[in-house]
Amino acid sequence: EMVALSGSHTIGQAR
């Protein structure tokens, strides 16, 4: 899973 915004699953979530 790759997050882009913060260190959580919010905006840039590519799962």
Swiss-Prot record:
Cofactor(s) demanded: heme b; Ca(2+)
Cofactor remark from the record: Binds 1 heme b (iron(II)-protoporphyrin IX) group per subunit. Binds 2 calcium ions per subunit.
InterPro entries the UniProt entry points to: Haem_peroxidase_sf, Peroxidases_heam-ligand_BS
GO cellular component: extracellular region
An individual GO BP term: hydrogen peroxide catabolic process
Sorted UniProt keywords: Calcium, Heme, Hydrogen peroxide, Iron, Metal-binding, Oxidoreductase, Peroxidase, Secreted
Binding of heme, residues: H9
Residues that hold Ca(2+) according to the record: T10
Example GO molecular function: metal ion binding
Catalytic activity line of the entry: 2 a phenolic donor + H2O2 = 2 a phenolic radical donor + 2 H2O
EC number in record: 1.11.1.7
Function: Removal of H(2)O(2), oxidation of toxic reductants, biosynthesis and degradation of lignin, suberization, auxin catabolism, response to environmental stresses such as wounding, pathogen attack and oxidative stress. These functions might be dependent on each isozyme/isoform in each plant tissue.
Family to which this protein belongs: Belongs to the peroxidase family. Classical plant (class III) peroxidase subfamily.
Protein name, as recorded: Peroxidase 4
Lineage start: Eukaryota, Viridiplantae, Streptophyta, Embryophyta, Tracheophyta
